[in-house]
């Protein structure tokens, strides 16, 4: 092939490559290769970042606050507002179409609000059953209530399998095996009030070794109140208040101002870092009496500081801590370790002069030093042995020969 023909083929291939690149750039479904060039319009406005849009969508920040912090281009703010309006209008149109479809559909009774009402009716007459044995199954409960209510005089209060609209029993895997066991409670729903009342009367009945506790499913009595921090506190009431989840920028003065209306504050003990001196995230506030710490736990205005929810509870009062006394070791041997006999115990001459008698400790009751194998140490056993001579032994003229 000649050089002219080769140059023509190269020109054709270049044109084909350029056309393919243009098509790839225009096609939104295909990914752009690293070789492809990107054209950037420097005059166009800078759009908001994903983080900024997310904060605006959740309502945590306003456009004015973002503009004051980042100095956003006004064109990008207008574009964001237009996009938000378009999304709202599109959502409203979809809702309107959805309402029309539910009205026009022939099976509209089974959709929308009608289905919700049916579910509410099904879950209206329910009971909560607690203190169940972990081996109890749904069939055990159904058989138990059917057998207990079949002899009731009122037919409406008799329970059958068809009358139980829903039975929810949460289950988890056992620790030592793969078998599934219930969590100790379940919910059971019936068709009418009479059946629910008949089952409620069976509370404290015996099933699988446990006395069942049956309550109305909407009766939440007995649960700890999350807002009652006094009852939720692990420690007994004291004048010390523990405050956790503090910001690192919190100071003693800020804490004192925040809790000063609760009572007289004696001192504030805040854990701080050695290098920066900032708060580690928790502190102890010592009030003059228990009323101050109790008021702080009850006051809802004290539960937030610097925009952070606080974790508060009673602290441990060390002044009320009971110190355990150490029990003195009593020797097993009842015999005295002192010899106070008239002959060996003490010097009578010293006693006659008015001075204190001198006691001599006897070594008879002492235990010999013993090693880990309960054997007397070699240094002690050979202490009284005669020391061998290290001199040269003279020859006796005897020579042993081996054949």
UniProtKB/Swiss-Prot annotation:
Gene3D superfamilies: 3.30.70.330. The modification N-acetylserine is found at residue 2. Pfam families: RRM_1 (PF00076). Residues 125-219, 239-317 form the RRM domain. It comes from Saccharomyces cerevisiae (strain ATCC 204508 / S288c) (Baker's yeast). Residues 99-108, 330-344, 371-381 have a biased composition (Polar residues). Residues 1-35, 75-97, 313-329, 345-361 have a biased composition (Basic and acidic residues). InterPro entries: Nop13/Rnp24_RRM1 (IPR034225), Nop13/Rnp24_RRM2 (IPR034226), Nucleotide-bd_a/b_plait_sf (IPR012677), RBD_domain_sf (IPR035979), RRM_dom (IPR000504). SMART domains: RRM. It comes from the Eukaryota. Keywords: Acetylation, Nucleus, Phosphoprotein, Repeat, RNA-binding. One of its GO terms (biological process) is formation of translation preinitiation complex. This is Nucleolar protein 13. Residues 1-43, 72-116, 313-403 are annotated as: Disordered. The modification Phosphoserine is found at residues 2, 335. The modification Phosphothreonine is found at residue 105.
């Amino acid at each position: 092939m000649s050089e002219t023909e080769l140059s023509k083929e190269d020109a054709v291939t270049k044109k084909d490559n350029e056309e393919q690149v243009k098509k790839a750039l225009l096609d939104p479904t295909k990914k752009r290769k690293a070789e492809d060039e990107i054209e950037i319009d420097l005059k166009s406005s800078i759009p908001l970042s994903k983080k900024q849009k997310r904060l605006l969508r959740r309502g945590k920040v306003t456009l004015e606050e973002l503009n004051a912090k980042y100095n956003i281009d006004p064109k990008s703010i207008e574009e964001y507002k237009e996009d938000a309006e378009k999304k709202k209008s599109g959502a409203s149109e979809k809702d309107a179409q959805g309402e029309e479809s539910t009205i026009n559909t022939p099976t509209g009774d089974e959709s929308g609000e009608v289905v919700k009402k049916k579910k509410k009716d099904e879950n209206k007459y329910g009971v909560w059953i607690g203190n169940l044995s972990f081996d109890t199954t749904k069939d055990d409960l159904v058989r138990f209530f059917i057998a207990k209510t079949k002899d009731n005089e009122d037919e409406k209060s008799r329970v059958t399998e068809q009358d139980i609209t829903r039975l929810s029993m949460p289950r988890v895997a056992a620790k030592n095996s793969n078998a599934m066991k219930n969590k100790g409670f379940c919910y059971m729903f019936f068709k009418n009030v009479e059946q629910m009342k008949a089952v409620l009367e069976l509370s404290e009945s015996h099933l699988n070794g446990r006395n069942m506790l049956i309550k109305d499913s909407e009766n939440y009595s007995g649960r700890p109140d999350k807002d009652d921090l006094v009852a939720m506190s692990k420690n007994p009431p004291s004048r010390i208040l523990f405050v956790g989840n503090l910001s690192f920028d919190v100071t003693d003065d800020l804490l004192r101002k925040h809790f000063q209306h609760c009572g007289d504050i004696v001192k504030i003990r805040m854990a701080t870092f050695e290098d920066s001196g900032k708060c580690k995230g928790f502190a102890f506030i010592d009030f003059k009496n228990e009323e101050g710490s109790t008021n702080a736990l009850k006051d809802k205005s004290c539960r937030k500081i610097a925009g952070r929810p606080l974790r508060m509870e009673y602290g441990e009062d060390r002044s009320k801590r009971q110190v355990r006394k150490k029990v003195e070791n009593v020797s097993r041997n009842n015999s005295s370790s002192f010899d106070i006999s008239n002959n060996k115990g003490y010097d009578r001459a010293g006693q006659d002069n008015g001075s204190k008698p001198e006691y001599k400790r006897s070594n008879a009751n002492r235990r010999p030093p013993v090693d880990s194998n309960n054997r007397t140490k070699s240094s002690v056993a050979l202490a009284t042995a005669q020391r061998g001579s290290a001199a040269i032994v003279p020859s006796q003229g005897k020579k042993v020969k081996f054949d």
